[in-house]
Curated annotation (Swiss-Prot):
<feature type="modified residue" description="N6-(pyridoxal phosphate)lysine">
    <location>
        <position position="239"/>
    </location>
</feature>
<feature type="binding site">
    <location>
        <position position="105"/>
    </location>
    <ligand>
        <name>pyridoxal 5'-phosphate</name>
    </ligand>
</feature>
<dbReference type="GO" id="GO:0019805">
    <property type="term" value="P:quinolinate biosynthetic process"/>
</dbReference>
<comment type="function">
    <text>Catalyzes the cleavage of L-kynurenine (L-Kyn) and L-3-hydroxykynurenine (L-3OHKyn) into anthranilic acid (AA) and 3-hydroxyanthranilic acid (3-OHAA), respectively.</text>
</comment>
<feature type="binding site">
    <location>
        <position position="213"/>
    </location>
    <ligand>
        <name>pyridoxal 5'-phosphate</name>
    </ligand>
</feature>
<dbReference type="GO" id="GO:0009435">
    <property type="term" value="P:NAD biosynthetic process"/>
</dbReference>
<comment type="subunit">
    <text>Homodimer.</text>
</comment>
<protein>
    <recommendedName>
        <fullName>Kynureninase</fullName>
        <ecNumber>3.7.1.3</ecNumber>
    </recommendedName>
</protein>
<dbReference type="GO" id="GO:0043420">
    <property type="term" value="P:anthranilate metabolic process"/>
</dbReference>
<feature type="binding site">
    <location>
        <position position="295"/>
    </location>
    <ligand>
        <name>pyridoxal 5'-phosphate</name>
    </ligand>
</feature>
<dbReference type="GO" id="GO:0030170">
    <property type="term" value="F:pyridoxal phosphate binding"/>
</dbReference>
<dbReference type="Pfam" id="PF22580">
    <property type="entry name" value="KYNU_C"/>
</dbReference>
<comment type="similarity">
    <text>Belongs to the kynureninase family.</text>
</comment>
<dbReference type="InterPro" id="IPR015422">
    <property type="entry name" value="PyrdxlP-dep_Trfase_small"/>
</dbReference>
<dbReference type="GO" id="GO:0030429">
    <property type="term" value="F:kynureninase activity"/>
</dbReference>
<dbReference type="GO" id="GO:0097053">
    <property type="term" value="P:L-kynurenine catabolic process"/>
</dbReference>
<comment type="pathway">
    <text>Amino-acid degradation; L-kynurenine degradation; L-alanine and anthranilate from L-kynurenine: step 1/1.</text>
</comment>
């Protein structure tokens, strides 16, 4: 990384790019000419290696037919476990604790069905009011399946400022009636990183199992689950991990829980050598593979093979180093160039509390996003008034960040956003 103090000049951006140790990975990705893509926290870009691995698995279907389950470069029968092994270094887990399977919401249903056991006074699930809505939908559903009322048995920690959560408030809410905790690792709006190590330790002091939704952190920040002793986690792979739209998700279960039967069992929960014995009594796998349910979505999984190879080469620590540097650069530029335009920084400024994206707040956010798109910049809008921007370490440049800020300054100065309605599109 370039170590010289921040300067708001174009030349400074070019120097940062010149000293970027990850710059060689930029050519791995398909980037549309004339476009600045800053939405990798919502959907990552396609890499050439991800494209190649998808085509390789299509070819294995073409060449081997049903024998593709055990033949070819990437036999389908073992693909979920292989990708779990490649994912493990990104979350600091053991390979056998990690599996690529299903979708984030389905995996939430799996871990809640497995770990939520309301007994006596311990009947409630602890979450928060800022988490992604689908997590809440799944928790409410699982509570109803236990014959309980979500309004009474789902506790949501309140935010003090509408942007972030206080870990002290979360710990204070870990009362004797809490049976299970599910929290985001990084908040999807503000990008705040929760202290997973501290929260896990505090939950375990009280005899509570705790897990995390990593959708906005995996591939962006390091995790150390073995050290922290986290009980379970779920995530998607299509954001920072660039697995493509509908890419298969991931699941982690601490190996100390491998004696626990999955709450939702299915065809691929089986031990591999027993699966085709066709017995009606399940012999569950003795690793995270037990928490699979149905047949792997092979073609939706395929791009992740190539993508995870890139992450293995780049290293999550190096990616985090650049992410912190380039997001700090974006914040400094915004502060220097956009004063007087009524923007508010909605994300934490401290490095240890900031994830991989920047969250700008403005009363005209929806139509500012539309104006940015009309000028070739791809951000995303989050209600009620947020513009999310992710300069991704693998493929975004400092020059792009500099150009983006100049474009936004022009939009605000010329009031170009007034040409658009201030409401979100169907897909924001």
């Amino acid at each position: 990384m370039y170590k010289e103090p921040f300067q708001p000049t174009y030349e400074y951006a070019l120097e940062c790019d010149k000293h970027d140790e990850l710059k060689d990975f930029q050519s791995e990705f398909y980037k549309k000419e004339g476009t600045i893509y800053l939405d990798g926290n919502s959907l990552g870009l396609l890499s050439k290696r991800a494209e190649k691995s998808l085509l390789t698995l299509l070819d294995s279907w073409k060449e081997f037919g049903i024998d593709g389950w055990t033949e070819g470069e990437h036999p389908w029968f073992f693909l979920s476990e292989k990708l779990g092994e490649l994912t493990a270094p990104l979350i600091g887990s053991l390979p056998e604790e990690t599996i690529v399977t299903s979708s984030t919401t389905a995996n939430i249903h799996q871990v809640i069905a497995t770990f939520y056991e309301p007994k006596g006074i311990r009947t409630k699930i602890l979450a928060d009011e800022l988490t992604f809505p689908s997590d809440i939908y799944a928790l409410q559903s699982q509570i109803r399946l236990k014959g309980l009322d979500p309004d009474e048995h789902l506790v949501r920690v309140k935010s003090r400022d509408g942007r972030t959560l206080s870990e002290d408030d979360i710990i204070h809410a870990m009362t004797d009636d809490i049976a299970l905790i599910l929290l985001p690792s990084v908040l999807y709006r503000s990008g705040q990183i929760l202290d997973m190590k501290r929260l896990t330790a505090e939950a375990h002091k009280r005899g509570i199992h705790i897990g995390f939704d990593l959708c906005h952190s995996i591939g962006s920040i390091p995790h150390h689950f073995k050290e922290w002793d986290v009980d379970f986690a779920v995530w998607c792979n299509y954001k920072y991990l660039n697995a493509g739209p509908g890419g298969v998700a991931g699941l982690y279960v601490n190996n100390k829980h491998f004696n626990r039967l999955p709450g939702l069992s299915g065809w691929f929960s089986s031990r591999k050598d027993k699966q085709f014995d066709m017995e009606h009594s399940l012999t569950a796998a003795d690793h995270a593979g037990a928490y699979q349910i149905g047949t792997p979505h092979v073609l939706s999984t395929a791009p992740l093979i190539g993508s995870l190879e890139i992450f293995k080469e780049a290293g999550i620590e190096k990616l985090r180093e650049k992410s912190l540097h380039i997001t700090r650069y974006m914040l400094d530029l915004i502060e220097h160039e956009l004063k007087g335009f009524e923007f508010t920084i909605g994300n934490p400024l401290e490095d240890e509390k900031r994830g991989g994206h920047i969250y700008l707040e403005h009363a005209e956010a929806a139509r500012i996003c539309k104006a940015l798109k009309a000028n070739g910049v791809i951000p995303d809008f989050r209600a009620p008034n947020g513009v999310r921007l992710a300069p991704v370490a693998l493929y975004n440049t400092y020059e792009e960040v500099w150009n983006y800020v100049q474009i936004l300054k022009k939009i605000m100065k010329n009031e170009e956003y007034k040409n658009f309605e201030n409401k979100r599109e169907v897909v924001a």
